[in-house]
Amino acid sequence: MSFFETLADRIEATDSVVSVGLDPDPNRLPEFLANADLPRWAFNRRIIDATHEHAACYKPNAAFYEDADGWRALEETIAYAHGKDVPVLLDAKRADIGNTTRQYAAALDRADAITVNPYLGRDSLQPFLDREEKGVFVLCRTSNPGGSDLQDLELASGEPLYERVAALADVWNGNDNVGLVVGATAPEELAEVREIVPEIPFLVPGVGAQGGDAEAAVEHGLADRPDAAVDVGLVNSSRGIIFAGEESSRPDDEATYFGAAGDAAKRLKKRLNQYR
C-alpha cells in the first residue's frame, strides 16, 4: 500500500487531517521528565498517547534528534506511532548528490514519508522518488518569513520559482508518491499552487504558532484524488499542540500537561473540519 493510500485510510478513520509535529525542544521539556532515560522519547510517547485519536500523521523534525540519544528516541517514537496505526512523516528536508542521497533515503526504512529539498534537482531526489511505497514531500512555498527571498523570484518565463517547483514535482510524480510543502502563511500562493497540481497532496505547516490561514490550508491543501474516499493532505501544528501544557492550569502536573496537548489537537481537528 502506498503512503497516500495509507494516509487516506487514516484520515477517513479519524475524520482528521491534523499532522502533529513532534519537535521535542530540550529547552522546553517539562521538568518532571528531566530524569527520564530518554527525555525526548518519554515526552513523545506521552504526546502520542494524548493525541493519537486526533492525528492523521506524526511529523518529527530530524533537527531535534541529531545526536546519539536523539536517534534512539526517534526510532522509539516512530515504532510507537506505528503501534497506534499512525503514519510518520520525517521532516528532514534532505537532498544531496549520488551516494550521499542514497544514504539519506535509507532513513525511510522506518518512516513512511519524508520532506526533501529540490534545490539540487531531480537526481538528488531520485532515490526517494524510487521508493514507490513512501511519500516524498518537496519543499515548494514554505511558511517562514524568508521563504520569499528565493521562492518568489521571477524566472525568465515570468513564473515565480515556487510555481516551477510545483510543475516539476508533477513531472517527477511517476510513482504517484509526491507531495508538496506549501505554508498556510502564504494563502494566495497556496491557491495558485493548487491550480497547477490539482491531485498532489500538500503538507501545510504554519497554522499553529505561526498563525497561518486555516481555511485556506484546508480549501487548497487537500487534494481531490480519484482513488480516495476523502480529500488527502495534512495540516501541521507542532508547538501549538505539543507545548500547549505550558499554558495549562497545572503545567507541573503530568496528566494536566499532556491532557492540554490532547485538547489542542482536538480543537485543531474541529477547527479544520469546519472547512472540509
Curated annotation (Swiss-Prot):
It is an enzyme of class 4 (lyase). Keywords: Decarboxylase, Lyase, Pyrimidine biosynthesis. CDD domains: OMP_decarboxylase_like. The active site is at K93 (proton donor). One of its GO terms (molecular function) is orotidine-5'-phosphate decarboxylase activity. Signal peptide: none annotated. Belongs to the OMP decarboxylase family. Type 2 subfamily. This is Orotidine 5'-phosphate decarboxylase. It comes from Halorubrum lacusprofundi (strain ATCC 49239 / DSM 5036 / JCM 8891 / ACAM 34). The gene is pyrF.
